[in-house]
């Protein structure tokens, strides 16, 4: 059942019950909800349709040879500027996107005697001196104004990058004399709030930008985000511009948070609780990782997943409050490019067909995603960094521009502007344009209710519907061809299915459809005659509790030495520990080579290892996956080889490790306490 429909229905029933009991006024919780600043439904409605193209300004395109930083992180020319973006607007528009996001463009003034590392950091824009001036190495206020106006004339929203939690040490006052308070990283709230409210409003009113991407949004408390959201809404309503259709409109006022973590941390530091929103949209880092782990590998070379891995990640959206609007991306300026991940995993090279097929599969998933999506420049042409694939040592990678957190900041390859694309690149670009155009024409894709039909090692299939627009999205997660038999009753289809790209029709035969799917192929099939799908509402039994001594939560601790000499901890991205060794997550020895710790856990998917405080030894589950109640082999861990533990329910869990007599790892289990 739709979480939002369920909650809405439940709210009505509760309200009716309260009325029947003679409730005389709002409860304390209701007063708190009414006092909070709600997410703007008009902004949310339009934001579903966002197809954003991200530009790293200093590395993108050199449009003015007289300016530029000339240094920075990554392997680019480091001469990118605003004019280069203006020169690329026709190309960007041709992709079928409808928005651009620029990394920070505000002035970062050198401090006398600063070293080359500070010069490189200045080029990123992420530590600004003057939030109210355009960096002269990027351009002028007039150039920025021209960029925004020309983008709007092409039907492109423009989003700036807001760094509201840190700044350069030589930060200068706002036009009204305000300054951020506290240290430079992070600043102090609520004292810094008026300064950043002024920043947020200034650029909307001055240039009529359409909103903000929010860097390290966890640095700003939820209450401050409510105030900044209201400032952005008010500023957006105070000005207008004429769009590409000749309509007079207000700036959109969209804001999207960067919180590089799991669903629970994104809730805690970004979205806020149900009924009391902090922020309304955040990048979907959890699903991004599952996406690359399915079609390539992640930055730590872990991959080989299938459709069920994607389905599990999408199902975890249920953890978010109703106002949450995740924004999915394949990459960004802090992540390794998808093409380089394919090479890191020894999966495919740019000369291989599969390199391009896997790109198309991953990008198709974005096109079928409900909510805003973001493309990083170069995604559309399968870009990669020459002579780079494996991780480079931290001692030398920054000098070479090859650290994982900045290697994707390569020079922009814009056809007809800064590069000439080859046939493979042109083909992928045309495919992306086709996807974006199709997505814009089908509300089922960008706003539809999602029903997963099939998810296994070989394929992922969703049914998407918005009003009478219904589409079946299929994507292969294997290199083998297959024939899919799809039941019409399950799909909610009473007639043909029609391929939205090829026009091919699949007739209904004996209650089902047969759809061929090549390796890593994606298809979008319109349901010509949609009906209510037959959904099995019987709750599937969840196995969360195991059997045997490893599943017992009350085994007594024994006062004797076990086979492991150091104290071990469950260490991971839990909201109560954040990869720190906490006493409440320390294992105790129970005898028989068994170590256990009982903890209170939230529902969700967590990345973790079992380690001593000095990380020697450290252990992980074999296969890097752990399911509740299932005994799994334990093996030696290392950096990046994290166990992904899926806990479908909140509650008390026991974590158990067993070892051989000689101290070698044996098995691991997590089990919900009964």
Where do the protein language model's features map onto the residues?
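Aromatic-rich carbohydrate-binding modules that target alpha-glucans
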Residues: 554-605, 611-639
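Short, acidic/polar
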Residues: 79-91, 189-205, 359-363
């Amino acid at each position: 059942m739709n979480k939002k429909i369920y909650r809405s229905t439940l709210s009505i029933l509760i309200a009716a019950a309260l009325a029947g009991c003679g409730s005389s006024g709002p409860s304390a919780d209701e007063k708190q909800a009414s006092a909070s600043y709600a997410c703007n439904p008009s902004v949310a409605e339009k934001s579903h349709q966002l197809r954003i193209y991200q530009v790293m300004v200093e590395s993108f395109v050199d449009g003015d040879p007289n300016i530029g930083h000339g240094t920075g992180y990554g392997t680019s020319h480091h001469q990118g500027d605003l004019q280069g973006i203006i020169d690329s607007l026709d190309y960007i528009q041709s992709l079928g996107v409808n928005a651009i996001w620029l990394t920070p463009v505000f002035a970062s003034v050198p401090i006398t005697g600063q070293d080359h590392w500070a010069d490189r950091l200045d080029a990123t824009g992420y530590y600004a001196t003057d939030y109210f001036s355009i960096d002269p190495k990027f351009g002028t206020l007039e150039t920025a104004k021209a960029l925004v106006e020309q983008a709007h004339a092409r039907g492109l929203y423009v989003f700036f990058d807001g760094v509201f939690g840190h700044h350069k040490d030589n930060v200068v006052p706002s036009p009204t004399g305000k300054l951020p308070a506290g240290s430079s990283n992070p600043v102090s709230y609520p004292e810094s709030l008026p300064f950043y409210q002024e920043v947020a409003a200034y650029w909307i009113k001055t240039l009529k930008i359409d909103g903000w991407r929010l860097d390290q949004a966890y640095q700003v408390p939820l209450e401050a985000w409510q105030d900044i959201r209201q400032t952005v809404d008010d500023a957006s309503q105070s000005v207008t511009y004429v769009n590409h259709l000749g309509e007079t409109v207000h700036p959109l006022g969209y804001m999207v948070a960067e919180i590089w973590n799991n669903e629970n941390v994104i809730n805690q530091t970004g979205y806020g609780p149900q009924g009391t929103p902090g922020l309304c949209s955040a990048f979907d880092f959890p699903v991004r990782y599952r996406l690359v782990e399915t079609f390539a590998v992640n930055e730590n070379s872990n991959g080989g997943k299938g459709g069920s891995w994607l389905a599990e990640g999408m199902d975890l959206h249920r953890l978010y409050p109703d106002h949450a609007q995740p924004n999915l991306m394949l990459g960004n300026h802090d992540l390794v490019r998808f093409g380089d991940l394919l090479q890191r995993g020894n999966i495919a090279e740019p000369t291989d067909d599969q390199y391009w097929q896997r790109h198309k599969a991953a990008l198709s998933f974005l096109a079928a995603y409900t909510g805003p999506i973001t493309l990083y420049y170069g995604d559309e042409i399968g870009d990669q960094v020459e002579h780079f694939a494996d991780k480079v040592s931290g001692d030398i990678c920054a000098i070479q521009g090859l650290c994982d957190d900045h290697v994707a900041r390569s020079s922009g390859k814009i056809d007809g502007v800064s590069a000439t694309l080859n046939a493979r690149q042109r083909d992928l670009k045309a495919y992306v344009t086709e996807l974006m155009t199709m997505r814009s024409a089908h509300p089922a894709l960008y706003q539809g209710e999602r029903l997963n039909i099939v998810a296994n090692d070989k394929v992922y299939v969703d049914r998407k519907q918005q009003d009478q627009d219904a589409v079946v999205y299929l994507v292969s997660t294997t290199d083998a061809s297959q024939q899919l038999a799809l039941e019409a009753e399950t799909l909610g289809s009473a007639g043909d299915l029609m391929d939205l790209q090829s026009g091919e029709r699949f007739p209904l035969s004996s209650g089902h459809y047969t759809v061929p799917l090549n390796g890593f192929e994606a298809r979008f099939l319109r349901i010509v005659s949609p009906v209510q799908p037959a959904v099995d509402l019987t709750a599937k039994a969840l196995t969360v509790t195991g059997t045997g001594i490893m599943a017992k939560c009350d085994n007594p601790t024994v006062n004797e030495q076990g086979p492991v000499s150091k104290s071990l901890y469950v260490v991971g991205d839990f909201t109560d520990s954040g990869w720190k060794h906490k006493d409440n997550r320390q294992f105790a020895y129970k005898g028989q080579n068994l170590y256990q710790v009982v903890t209170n856990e939230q529902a969700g998917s967590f990345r973790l290892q079992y380690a001593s405080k000095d990380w020697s030894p450290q252990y992980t589950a074999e296969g890097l996956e752990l399911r509740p109640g299932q005994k799994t082999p334990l093996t030696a861990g290392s950096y990046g080889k994290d166990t992904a533990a899926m806990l479908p329910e909140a509650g008390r869990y026991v974590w158990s490790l067993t070892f051989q007599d000689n101290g070698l790892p044996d098995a691991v289990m997590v089990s919900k306490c009964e």
